[in-house]
């Protein structure tokens, strides 16, 4: 398998991240949520600079109460205005997560599909700020070497194989994993049972 050098990896990741930022701005998703009084936090790989080849953008959206109608009103506005291909809705209001999940597929002008994970969370609930703290902790521990390792592993994950980014970070920080092959072995014997409880 052809390995990219470190500069290739960084340049490609940076290009993909710049595209993601443009998509985020172009879609106007954050202002759409702010119009219902929500506070929106970017989390995950785009926030930490670890977005590689996946076209995923993660947003955590906070309101004082969870109003299903208000949440749907934002999605209706986005669906009418944007080229959304799929919308998935999960109502977890009555669980300890106290949230509404929206998973949306959006097609950009180049016909690339982007996935927006928008988690609408009640302010003050158990998981308020948890992913934000994890994203910050991961970002703060990144060295150039660790960043390159994580990006290389992400680029080496075969197309069609879904591995949550948090599992890759866990393997690199805790297990000293340095390649996709090592990641596969590590995950077999060191499953990350609750990603929300782990900080690097």
For each feature predicted by the language model, list its residue ranges.
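Helical scaffold of the NTase/Pol beta-like nucleotidyltransferase catalytic core
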Residues: 1-43
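Active-site nucleotide-donor binding segment shared across nucleotidyl transfer reactions
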Residues: 29-72
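Generic structural hydrophobic/aromatic packing signal, biased to beta-strands
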Residues: 33, 40, 78, 104, ...
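Short, charged/polar surface micro-motifs in flexible loops or helix N-caps
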Residues: 64-69, 111-112, 123-126
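Short amphipathic alpha-helices in soluble, non-transmembrane regions
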Residues: 71-80
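Conserved catalytic core of two-metal-ion nucleotidyltransferases
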Residues: 82-122
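Catalytic cores of NTP-dependent nucleotidyl/adenyl transfer enzymes across multiple folds
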Residues: 115-200
